[in-house]
Amino acid sequence: MAEAHAEKHHDYHLVNPSPWPVFGAICAFLTAVGGIVWMRSMGGGEGLFGLRGPGLFAVGFLGILFTMLMWWRDVIKEAHGGDHTPVVQLHLRYGMILFIASEVMFFVAWFWAYFDASLFPAGIHPLEITTPDGATEATKQMIGMVERNALTGGHWPPKPSANFHGTFDPWGLPLVNTLILLTSGTTVTWAHHALLQGDRRGLKWGLLITIVLGVLFTACQAYEYVHAGFKYAGHIYGATFFMATGFHGAHVIIGTLFLTVCFFRALAGHFTPKQHFGFEAAAWYWHFVDVVWLFLFACIYVIGAGTPLAH
């Protein structure tokens, strides 16, 4: 009976105990706390564990990257050990789809914040929320309507001032970044089709070019931030701009790292035309990053262009 039970086929495998979920959660907490302290005090504040906002954020973010690499290592070992049966692969796909769906909702929140501020910059809301005693002003203050008028000057984008020198020209560097990401989406698709056709050389070159384009996009975004005519603090435009584009930039960095892992796996002879979910998941994620940028470019850079910054 024991031998029969041992030889029984199972569609699922029991994963070994792993420290990465707990470690990753701790690092995510440190990143969130560090980001909050950093944004509220722009580098000051009391911090946590002797670290101020930027330091705490950096420790947490580096911890997240380390967790990703180590967790990917373990998953790759499971795949090479034959643990990823067709049923397991199917549910890995479901998991990746749900993860991307949650990321979509994450960016919906930032688009919501941006459009709420841009459509009602003067603090006038179409819904007059009143209490039984008619305390309209108090209610407006609770939802941020009163302060918004002071922060935006009643205009979106804010008019040029000492703290706001203008927005970016969407047909300059933002357009270049758009072309870079669209090209990277093409090259990662080329790599995928090359893999399906057994073209290992095309797979490697497609991945390498995509990684280079991802790094180039990040460099251009960093240059744009350095030369921005406004800062994060002081007005809603800067806050929503840097949060939306900044989180997208973080996703580009993560996606580039994801593809880099796939590139080194391809060099090591991993992936076959029939079994390559690791690369497929990275390609899905990269296409998601592309689509989000198209919405950011259209909504924030083009529609919300306002007065372009004079260089």
Which residues make up each language-model segment?
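...captures the hydrophobic TM-helix bundle architecture rather than a specific catalytic motif
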Residues: 1-311
